C-alpha cells in the first residue's frame, strides 16, 4: 500500500514513529535496567546496550517485515487508514468500477478518445495550443504539469501554481525539456504573485491560465515557469498539440485495461490495480484525509502537545541566547525567526467548502476524472484564503515532491512557511497515550518537536528568514563557522558504520543528523531544568537523567535484513537507527558521567571533539 511510506524524499521530514508497546517499562521515570545486558558496553554501542532485550528477542529470526518503532507505528497507522478507506463510498465506487473495467473497456476507451479530441478541438494556433495545455493541467495530466496550492509571501494567502514533471531522460511527455527537479519550484526561489501586463496584451502564461480556468490574480510563478515558457515558445504548434494528445491518452487509457497500463508505462506496472495504487494519493488523498480526521480526532492529545511545543520553543530560545559561536546580529535574527515559528498539531479544524465527488462506480476512468474535477474545485475554493486558517489542508495540494496527507504518520518543518506540524497519527495510540510516562514524553515527543524546530536552522532552513522568505540573515563569519560545524558533523557520522565495513553517508544525512543532535539538546535541557526546579538532586536526578537517554535510545530500534539496510541507506536522508542514537549521545557531556564512559570506549570523544551546533 502506498500509505506505508516511513521515509519521505523531500521537505526534510522527520520520520519518527513511536510504538509505546516497545518502550522500556518505567516506574517513577526509572528505566527498567533488567533489559540491559551486562556483556554490552554502553560506551562501545549505546544503541545495543539500551535495546538489548528487544534485539535479543529477535535473534535467529530473519524479519519478514521491517521491525522497530518506526515501522510498527507505520503499520498501525496503515491499518487505520485501510479501515477508513474500506468505509469510504468513493473508494467502494473505485473498486467496483475497477472490477468492471474489462466489461466496460469499449465505453472507457471511447470516453478517453472523446476527451482527448475535445481538448484539442479546433486548435490550430500557438495561442490555442497554450490554452489546450492549461486544459490538460486542469484535467490532471501529470506528464504535462500538475496543479498545486502554495502560500503567497506577500499577504500570507493561498495561491496556485502548476508544477512541471520530473526530468526523464531528455524530455518530458509534453515535449518541453525539464532541467531541474520539481522542488526547485519552492526550494530555490520563492513563488511570487503573477501580475498581468495589460500594456503588451496576453502572454503565453495568460493563455495557459485561460485553459486552467482559475483567476490569474491567484497565480504564483517562479524562474522555472519562465524557463518552461521560454522553451515552450520554441516548439512547433503541431508538436505541442500532438504531445498533449499523446499525454492525455497515455494517462487515461491506463485506467481502461491491464494491457493499456503495461503499454503506456512501458512495463513499469502490470495491472490497472497497480496503476491505481500509484495514483491513489493524487486522486483520493484529500478524501482519505478528511474521513481519517472524522474517525480519529486528536482533541484529547492536543493540549499536551501544545504545551510541549511551547516548552521546547522556550528551551531552544534559551540555548540561542547562550550561544557562543554566533555574532550578536545573527543571534538576534535567529531568535526572531524562532519567535515567529508556527506550531501546528493534530486534526485540521477547518476544511474547504468543496463538495465531495459522487462517483458512479461504472467507468473507472470517468470516476478518476470526477475525482480530479473535485480536486480542482477544492483548490479553487482555497484561493485567496488565509494560509494560517487552512494550515495544514493546503499541504495536500502543495508539494514539490509529493503531497503531505493528514493521515500520514509523521511530523515536518516547512522552511518556506517557518512552521512545523505534528500530524494526527503521531497523537493517536499507540504513538501517544495520556498515560505516557513524563520522562518518556520528553525523550520522545520532546526530542521530536525539538528536531523539527532545529530544521529551521539546518543547512536548508538557515537560508530562509522568519517570514519564510529565501533571504540571507547570516554574517559572512557566522556562515563560515556554521559550514565548519556542519562539516564536522558530516565527518563524525561518516566515521560510523551502517554495517561492518560499510561507512555511513554523512554528507547525505547531515541535515537530519544536525536536527537529531539539536532536538536532543533542546529536549534534554528542558527535562533536566524541570527536574532541578522540582528540587530533585543526587542519585534520583542521576537515575532520571539516565532514563531520558534510555528512552531516547528506544526510539530508533529497528530490525532489517542487511540488504534492506543497505538499500535504505543508499537513498534515505536519515541515518540508520543505531547511528542516530550513538551519533548523538557521544556528543553529550552528561552521557559520559551517567554511563561511566572512558577513553577506551569506542564511542568516546574528547571534550574538544564533541560537537554542539544548536
Residue ranges and their predicted role:
Residues 2-12:
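Bacterial N-terminal signal peptides that target proteins for export
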Residues 11-22:
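Bacterial N-terminal signal peptides
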Residues 23-31:
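Bacterial Sec-dependent N-terminal signal peptides
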Residues 80-312:
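Noncatalytic, helix-rich "gating/capping" subdomain that lines the substrate-entry/channel surface
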Residues 289, 293-614:
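Intrinsically disordered, low-complexity linker/terminal regions across diverse proteins
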Residues 32-34, 39-72, 176, 181, ...:
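His/Glu-rich zincin catalytic helix
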Residues 41-44, 49-112:
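Active-site-surrounding "flap" and adjacent substrate/cofactor-binding loops of secreted or lumenal enzymes
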Amino acid at each position: 500500500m502506498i500509505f506505508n511510506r516511513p521515509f519521505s524524499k523531500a521537505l526534510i521530514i522527520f520520520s519518527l514513529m513511536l510504538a509505546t508497546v516497545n518502550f522500556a517499562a518505567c516506574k517513577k521515570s526509572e528505566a527498567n535496567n533488567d533489559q540491559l545486558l551486562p556483556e554490552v558496553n554502553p560506551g562501545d554501542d549505546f544503541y545495543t546496550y539500551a535495546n538489548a532485550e528487544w534485539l535479543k528477542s529477535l535473534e535467529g529470526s530473519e524479519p519478514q517485515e521491517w521491525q522497530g518503532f518506526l515501522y510498527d507505528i507505520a503499520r498501525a497507522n496503515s491499518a487505520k487508514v485501510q479501515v477508513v478507506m474500506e468505509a469510504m463510498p468513493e473508494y467502494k465506487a473505485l473498486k467496483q468500477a475497477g472490477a468492471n473495467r474489462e466489461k466496460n473497456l469499449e465505453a472507457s476507451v471511447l470516453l478517453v478518445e472523446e476527451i482527448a479530441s475535445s481538448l484539442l478541438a479546433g486548435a490550430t494556433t500557438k495561442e490555442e495550443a497554450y490554452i489546450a495545455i492549461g486544459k490538460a493541467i486542469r484535467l490532471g495530466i501529470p506528464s504535462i504539469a500538475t496543479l498545486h496550492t502554495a502560500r503567497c509571501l506577500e499577504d500570507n494567502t493561498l495561491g496556485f501554481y502548476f508544477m512541471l514533471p520530473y526530468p526523464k531522460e531528455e524530455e518530458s511527455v509534453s515535449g518541453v525539456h525539464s532541467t531541474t527537479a520539481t522542488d526547485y519550484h519552492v526550494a530555490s526561489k520563492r513563488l511570487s504573485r503573477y501580475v498581468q501586463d495589460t500594456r503588451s496584451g496576453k502572454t503565453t502564461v495568460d493563455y495557459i491560465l485561460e485553459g486552467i480556468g482559475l483567476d490569474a490574480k491567484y497565480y504564483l510563478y517562479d524562474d522555472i515557469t519562465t524557463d518552461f515558457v521560454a522553451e515552450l515558445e520554441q516548439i512547433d504548434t503541431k508538436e505541442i498539440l500532438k504531445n498533449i494528445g499523446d499525454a492525455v491518452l497515455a494517462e487515461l487509457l491506463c485506467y481502461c485495461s491491464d494491457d493499456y497500463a503495461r503499454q503506456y508505462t512501458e512495463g513499469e506496472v502490470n495491472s490497472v490495480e497497480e496503476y491505481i495504487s500509484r495514483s491513489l494519493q493524487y486522486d483520493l488523498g484529500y478524501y482519505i484525509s478528511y474521513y481519517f480526521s472524522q474517525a480519529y480526532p486528536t482533541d484529547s492529545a492536543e493540549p499536551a502537545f501544545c504545551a510541549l511545543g511551547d516548552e521546547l520553543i522556550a528551551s531552544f530560545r534559551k540555548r540561542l541566547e547562550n550561544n557562543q559561536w554566533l555574532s550578536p546580529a545573527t543571534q538576534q535574527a535567529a531568535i526572531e525567526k524562532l519567535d515567529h515559528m508556527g506550531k501546528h498539531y493534530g486534526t485540521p479544524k477547518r476544511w474547504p467548502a468543496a463538495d465531495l465527488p459522487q462517483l458512479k462506480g461504472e467507468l473507472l476512468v470517468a470516476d478518476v476524472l470526477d475525482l480530479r474535477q473535485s480536486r480542482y474545485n477544492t483548490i479553487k475554493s482555497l484561493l485567496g484564503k488565509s494560509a494560517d486558517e487552512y494550515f495544514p489542508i493546503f499541504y495536500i495540494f502543495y508539494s514539490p515532491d509529493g503531497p503531505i496527507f493528514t493521515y500520514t504518520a509523521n511530523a515536518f518543518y516547512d522552511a518556506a512557511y517557518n512552521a512545523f506540524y505534528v500530524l494526527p497519527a503521531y497523537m493517536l495510540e499507540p504513538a501517544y497515550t495520556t498515560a505516557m510516562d513524563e520522562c518518556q514524553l520528553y525523550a520522545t515527543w520532546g526530542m521530536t518537536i525539538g528536531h523539527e524546530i532545529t530544521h529551521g536552522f539546518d543547512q536548508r532552513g538557515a537560508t530562509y528568514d522568519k517570514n519564510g522568505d529565501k533571504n540571507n540573515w547570516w554574517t559572512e563569519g557566522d556562515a563560515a563557522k556554521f559550514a565548519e560545524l556542519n562539516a564536522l558533523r558530516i565527518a563524525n557520522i561518516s566515521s560510523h558504520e551502517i554495517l561492518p565495513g560499510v561507512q555511513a553517508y554523512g554528507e547525505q544525512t547531515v541535515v537530519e543528523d544536525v536536527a537529531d543532535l539539536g532536538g536532543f539538546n533542546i529536549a534534554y535541557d528542558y527535562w533536566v531544568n524541570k527536574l532541578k526546579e522540582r528540587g530533585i538532586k543526587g542519585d534520583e536526578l542521576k537515575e532520571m537523567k539516565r532514563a531520558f537517554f534510555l528512552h531516547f535510545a528506544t526510539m530508533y530500534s529497528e530490525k532489517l535484513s542487511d540488504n534492506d539496510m543497505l538499500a535504505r541507506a543508499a537513498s534515505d536522508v536519515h541515518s540508520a537507527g543505531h547511528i542516530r542514537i550513538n551519533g548523538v549521545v557521544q556528543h553529550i557531556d552528561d552521557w559520559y558521567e551517567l554511563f561511566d564512559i572512558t577513553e577506551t570506549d569506542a564511542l568516546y570523544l574528547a571534550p574538544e571533539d564533541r560537537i554542539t551546533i544548536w
